Amino acid sequence: MRAVVLPVAALALLFATHGAVVVTGGSMEPTLSPGDVCVYRKTRDVRAGQVMVFEREAGQGLVVHRAVTVGLRGEVRSRGDANEVSDPGVVAAERVRGPVVVALPVGRFVRR
């Protein structure tokens, strides 16, 4: 019984402080590919240069992009690594889910 309880407790603790999202587009290539799984730390504290997860406006899903600049109130200007220009507007601090801490390159193996 212990062999089951400990891993389940560890996973519950992990997902209390972390989340996971699957990359769906190519805007972060070559850093991340469609199908890759990103684990992120649930915090609004992101720094310029970090890959982060944020909510689209009106709850339309999650986006994985790089933080280009972070303002004094935590608002973030973002950009996909494959994009030549930054995303329009800024991401309000309330929509930031957190920085990516681990990226699992699942998409690179599944697509081939």
Predicted features, each with a name:
Residues M1-R112:
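Extended hydrophobic leader/signal-anchor segments used for secretion and membrane insertion
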